[in-house]
UniProtKB/Swiss-Prot annotation:
Glycosylation sites: 177, 198, 539, 687
Protein purpose: Part of a complex composed of PLOD1, P3H3 and P3H4 that catalyzes hydroxylation of lysine residues in collagen alpha chains and is required for normal assembly and cross-linkling of collagen fibrils. Forms hydroxylysine residues in -Xaa-Lys-Gly- sequences in collagens. These hydroxylysines serve as sites of attachment for carbohydrate units and are essential for the stability of the intermolecular collagen cross-links.
Subunit structure: Homodimer. Identified in a complex with P3H3 and P3H4.
UniProt-annotated binding residues for Fe cation: 657, 659, 709
Protein name (database record): Procollagen-lysine,2-oxoglutarate 5-dioxygenase 1
GO cellular component, one term: collagen-containing extracellular matrix
A biological process term (GO) from this entry: cellular response to hormone stimulus
UniProt catalytic activity: L-lysyl-[collagen] + 2-oxoglutarate + O2 = (5R)-5-hydroxy-L-lysyl-[collagen] + succinate + CO2
InterPro entries on file: Collagen_mod_GT25, IPNS-like_FE2OG_OXY, Nucleotide-diphossugar_trans, Oxoglu/Fe-dep_dioxygenase_dom, Pro_4_hyd_alph, Procol_lys_dOase
Glycoprotein keyword on record: yes
Organism, scientific name: Rattus norvegicus (Rat)
Alphabetized GO MF terms: ferrous iron binding; L-ascorbic acid binding; peptide binding; procollagen-lysine 5-dioxygenase activity
Species lineage: Eukaryota, Metazoa, Chordata, Craniata, Vertebrata
Protein's cellular compartments: Rough endoplasmic reticulum membrane
Length: 728
């Protein structure tokens, strides 16, 4: 019975405490100035709503008199608006008012903690404090000394009782573009006024954290299901985080997490807010998208780029196409694509290399085409070095419903990506704390970042509103990509990056050669994923799993390895080179100068392709060899790798012989019955023949000891095979 009474008493006390807290929080009002509803303002409201703050916005719809918005220099307009708003609260003794900027502010905790810390300050008004004095450094000597903490007043955030705040602003008679910070500073530095109003500064950042001058002090603190900003210098957890001065990008970074927008336990909690679903919408009703394609330098795998563009799961009749091709090298490819598929799009505009339009001007033209067309709902800018392998990419980006958003793209096996998580002091790359985790997928979400490039989606409405007067791709002497980001940031438009899906990757252009007929063949080192997609047979993985390997003769294995394109390009490359051997025993290309079993051929090293061919053997042939010949391991070394040409009137067949190899690879590069008749390979010891080689399939067999074989006569047409004597 006694225990029950104790429990009842405890419950009553807790209930009473909760009611007192609720009553206390009812006496808190947050005032802020926002002349327009920017993305920063919406972020501020979202963090306030998370903690159930009561918000009143002042000045919505007014013109802002000072350049740079309410967080910029000037600020007298904020004092005027506050003075007017406080008139109806001047006699409310118990009302606590928090006045903060909004575009660059987030809340990290709720009213209860805020009020507790305010009461502990034992002042009627508490201003945020800063490391740096602004705007008049001559006033530094007048500031009271502080043994520990920030010394100088910051006007971006302060809290106080309504009557005291009314007294604070009562003397304001300034202009809208006068400095609010200087006004408050002079009041604070007047000992009589400071004491009369009872003003103090939040020296140790218990309530307010101004980031300017304090970036090295502030880190994210991940608690269970909650995220705070921690000040390491004073070991405090501020309630209000303010990206004052040049630190707006840092509050963008912190705002990706605080207060609980991303945690290790929950992941992203806001990624599904405000989505624009495209499910159930017919093709004709889908938003119209202008796709801007930019080919600004020689780029590998352009054929794959266009194929992926065609395979986007979005109706071409709702897409318009703008292509800027700076490169004469790609002129025929672009024109061929448009000749075959241009009619599938709603409209097409091509600016070719003959126009000599600069990169930035072309990008401005693409954005303008959407900006000036009211029916253009989205502008999708894609550089040719983007491998967009997710067919739903465009839909996924549209559904995320952001003004500007980019999908994460990285280079194969590297941390290089199409975004920066932070900027250095001079506006160039700096690595944010979360950069590697985002790139490697350990943190997944939608991230507010300062720089994106290569591929992004912009709402047409943003181009016609916030970005309507902007020359987007020129800014000082910056490159077009950095100019674009600087201009977008300056207009207070957020740029988001999503890594919620695997959208694709970036090509490496560093070592791209343009001296061959088919330059993509040489990209096996720089861009292995795309090389595999273009050149390795789609059923190779089945062969590797043992599901598609045939044995036409004893210890002879037959499996798919090359695509049609790989076969065709290798043949065309050899014919383009054209220096076929004579097919006699004298051969200066090999050691000793004598060939016992001569063929009419071209060696891989003659076209400087031996490194790439060895890489192909190591990556794709060696794993199969080790599966098919258990216990044998190879590094796929070779002295001879070549393409052989058989013609009835040239060299139709090959005499019986052993190969100078441990094992041999023989890949058919064209098709029997279409390109030639006859041909094939006969293994004499087993009296077994392969008479109908399949294009793109490889025969693999032992070389110098057991598999004595001959090349059967080609009776019509021209037959090509790629041969490698492996581990001689």
């Amino acid at each position: 019975m006694r225990s029950l009474l104790l429990l009842a008493s405890l419950a009553w006390l807790l209930l009473a405490q909760a009611k007192d807290d609720a009553k206390l929080e009812d006496n808190l009002l947050v005032l802020t100035v926002a002349t327009k509803e920017t993305e920063g303002f919406r972020r501020f409201k979202r963090s306030a709503q998370f903690f159930n703050y009561k918000i009143q916005s002042l000045g919505l719809g007014e013109d802002w008199s000072a350049a740079g918005g309410p967080s910029a220099a000037g600020g007298g307009q904020k004092v005027r608006l506050l003075k007017k708003a406080l008139k109806k609260y001047a006699d409310k003794e118990d009302l606590v008012i928090l006045f903060v900027d909004s575009y660059d502010v987030v809340f990290a905790s709720g009213p209860r903690e805020l009020l507790k810390k305010f009461q502990q300050a034992k002042s009627r008004v508490v201003f945020s404090a800063e490391e740096l004095i602004y705007p008049d450094r001559r006033l530094e000597a007048k500031y009271p000394t502080v043994p520990d903490g920030k010394r100088f007043l910051g006007s971006g955030g302060f809290i106080g009782y309504a009557p005291s705040l009314s007294k604070l602003v009562a003397e304001w008679e300034g202009q809208d573009n006068d400095s609010d910070q200087l006004f408050y500073t002079k009041i604070f530095l007047d000992p009589e006024k400071r004491e009369q109003i009872n003003i103090s500064l939040d020296h140790r950042c218990r309530i307010f954290q101004n980031l300017d001058g304090a970036l090295d002090e502030v880190v994210l603190k991940f608690e269970m299901g909650h995220v705070r900003a921690r000040n390491l210098a004073y070991d405090t957890l501020p309630v209000v985080i303010h990206g004052n001065g040049p630190t707006k990008l840092q509050v963008n970074y912190l705002g990706n997490y605080i207060p609980r927008f991303w945690t290790f336990e929950t992941g992203c909690t806001v990624c599904d807010e405000g989505l624009r679903s495209l499910k159930g919408i017919g093709d004709e009703a889908l938003p119209t998208v202008l796709v801007g394609v930019f080919i600004e330098q020689p780029t590998p795998f352009l054929s794959l780029f266009f194929r992926r563009l065609l395979h986007l799961r979005y109706p071409q009749k709702q897409m318009r196409l703008f292509i800027h091709n700076q490169e004469q090298h790609h002129k025929l490819q672009v024109e061929q694509f448009l000749a075959e598929h241009g009619g599938e799009y709603q409209s097409v505009k091509l600016v070719g290399p003959e126009v000599r339009m600069a990169n930035a001007d072309a990008r401005n033209m693409g954005a303008d085409l959407c900006r000036q067309d009211q029916t253009c709902t989205y502008y999708f800018s894609v550089d040719a070095d983007v491998a967009l392998t997710e067919p739903n990419s465009l839909r996924l980006l549209i559904e995320q419903n952001k003004n500007v958003i980019a999908p994460l793209m990285t280079r194969h096996g590297r941390l290089w990506s199409n975004f920066w998580g932070a900027l250095s002091a001079d506006g160039y790359y700096a690595r944010s704390e979360d950069y590697v985790d985002i790139v490697q997928g350990r943190r997944v979400g939608v991230w507010n970042v300062p720089y994106i490039s290569n591929i992004y989606l912009i709402k047409g409405s943003a181009l016609r509103a916030e970005l309507r007067h902007v020359d987007l791709f020129h800014y000082s002497k910056l490159d077009p990509d950095m100019s674009f980001c600087a201009n977008v940031r300056q207009q207070e438009v957020f740029m988001f990056l999503t890594n919620r899906h695997t959208f694709g990757h970036l090509l490496s252009l560093d070592n791209y050669q343009t001296t061959h007929l088919h330059n993509d063949l040489w990209e096996v080192f720089s861009n292995p994923q795309d090389w595999k997609e273009k050149y390795i047979h789609e059923n190779y993985t089945k062969a590797l799993a043992g599901k598609l390997v045939e044995t036409p003769c004893p210890d002879v294995y037959w499996f798919p390895i090359f695509t049609e394109v790989a076969c065709d390009e290798l043949v065309e490359e050899m014919e383009h080179y054209g220096q076929w051997s004579l097919g006699d025993n004298k051969d200066n290309r090999i050691q000793g100068g004598y060939e016992n079993v001569p063929t009419i051929d071209i060696h891989m090293n003659q076209i400087t392709f031996e490194r790439e061919w060895h890489k192909f053997l190591v990556e794709y042939i060696a794993p199969l060899t080790e599966k098919l010949y258990p216990g044998y391991y190879t590094k796929a070394q070779f002295d001879l790798a070549f393409v052989v040409r058989y013609k009835p009137d040239e060299q139709p067949s090959l005499m019986p012989h052993h190969d100078a190899s441990t094992f041999t690879i023989n890949i058919a590069l064209n098709r029997v019955g279409e390109d030639y008749e006859g041909g094939g390979c006969r293994f004499l010891r087993y009296n077994c023949s392969v008479r109908a080689p399949r294009k793109g399939w490889a025969l693999m067999h032992p070389g110098r000891l057991t598999h004595y074989h001959e090349g059967l006569p080609t009776t019509k047409g021209t037959r090509y095979i790629a041969v490698s004597f492996v581990d001689p």
